[in-house]
Amino acid sequence: MENKNKIKVIIPFYNPGDFLDMCISSVLTQDYENYEVLFIDDCSTDNSYSKIPGCVYKHDENGQPIKDENGELIIIEKHPLLDRTKCLNVMAWKASSRATALPNIHNGIMNFATNPDDIVVILDGDDWLSGKGALSYINDFYNQNPECWMMYGSSKWTDGRRCCSSPYPEYEFKNLRAAPFRISHIRTFRAGLYHKIGEQDNMFSCMKDKEGNWYTMTYDVAMFLPMLEMAGFEHIKHNSKPLYIYNRDNPISDDKVNQQKQWDIHEEINNKSPFKKIESYK
């Protein structure tokens, strides 16, 4: 019998405008059934969270969901579910203050993807999946590659051109922090692999600056370098089929706003201590 992995799609966004419509539509029309979606609104000012079908849940200033005296999540708003979502579980968090993507994604994984076998898919709110079979393909990929703990790639620009994406050669795992960073959209991994970061760095300082603040951009490098190092070459797989549409038309994209800061943060991350390889993500 085919294994239907639980897939957790985490979608952080800030002022995505009408691009969020494409994102929502691409996620809610998937032909895969065993998946859940968490939208995280980083205090948008364009009222984009009102487009999200489902429930908006209350959480504190650290991004932790707040429960009532019965242990139930507190719903602050309800938006109508589209018929096409069927029994899909859609959740949303609305931040009370700007936090940026990295702490929002971190809190999403730690609170939403608690089973180590969950497959986490990161989808930015101004991007979208390339077709209705994207999640089915991801499920099949992990089933066909049981040794895989992380699968990444590939994507296209909105004009149809393929984005640059390449597999890691094995020799680069001798010093990943000196190698080119190759983790491109679509970014997926077993939740347990991310949880293991906390066993070697319980404060997740690998994702924070010298003052202890979460990095405000370059979240992909901060998140994925530790996971790459812990997993090792044999547990990382590159996918060549485009499953993701990467949208650079949003004028507030990080690489358009402050590219130099991105490079500076990347260099700071590379200078941190590497993580030790692990035997299992569970």
What do these predicted ranges mean?
Residues E2-Y281:
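Nucleotide-sugar donor-binding/catalytic module of glycosyltransferases
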